[in-house]
Regions:
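GST-like domain detector, emphasizing the conserved glutathione-binding G-site
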Residues: 1-120
């Protein structure tokens, strides 16, 4: 089971979409950023940069103790690797996925966030 510390933001939503598409069991743990939940000591143990989403996988890839992962891109890469889906086995295929992920995270995503923020 995967706990996703979540609030309905674009980054939170893209991880829940990945969890659904990968058919993984998960439980939403609300992280109300309007109330400041992301600054709690408990949350900072999972996501030291106080940003969500973050996950705790209680049945991690490779076994062992639960693993915490923060940052939406890192989470999606982990989930893809864990399930063997959406991430190629070849160098060319991996970097085809990575370049588009970085494009979304570094370019498109921030601009969409600004468009929404300044239209309130």
């Amino acid at each position: 089971m995967i706990d996703i510390h979540y609030w309905p933001t674009p980054n939170g939503k893209k991880v829940t979409i990945a969890l659904e598409e990968l058919d993984l069991e998960y439980k939403i743990v609300a992280c109300n950023i309007g109330r400041g939940d992301q600054f709690s000591d408990e949350f900072l143990e999972i996501s030291p940069n106080n940003r969500m989403p973050a996950i705790v996988d209680h049945d991690p890839l490779g076994g062992g103790d639960p693993i915490s992962i923060f940052e939406s891109g890192a989470i999606m890469l982990y989930l893809a690797e864990k399930t063997g889906r959406f991430f190629a086995d070849t160098t060319r295929g991996k970097y085809d996925v990575l370049q588009w992920l970085m494009f979304q995270m570094g370019g498109v995503g921030p601009f969409f966030g600004q468009a929404n923020h300044f239209n309130r």
